């Protein structure tokens, strides 16, 4: 839970900083958000490489075998936090969706072109789409929501709480391929 809190806070803080570019031209704003997404990716890329974690050892090991969630899970819920904050502040509209899609596209393009990752299972996001991954994400989000009341007594600012996640769809099999 501590990592979820720290990751979520970092994603929200960086998004708030980048929102300072809102009045800039569209090209600058989009490039700035792409850089935000790429910087989060690169951060979790370092964690993944330093801990030698990949798709196969995530599926083989117990979720609690490590003291930190898998980097792809952490990156995924940070991206969700960014999208959620954008929508809450600027509304759910075409421009916001374009910013979010652009950030994901920047990550995918970086993985495919710069890192030459050929298969989806090689992407850090792949884990988040597995049955085990969605259960893990749901557990982290709902677990955090249960802790908010406890920690709010120690906080100087309101603690961000998300809606309860009842269910998430998984779309990646244990082989790393998309389910049909």
What are these regions, as identified by a protein language model?
Residues 27, 55-180:
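Non-catalytic terminal regions of proteins
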Residues 1-55, 81, 92:
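Short helix/loop segments within enzyme catalytic domains
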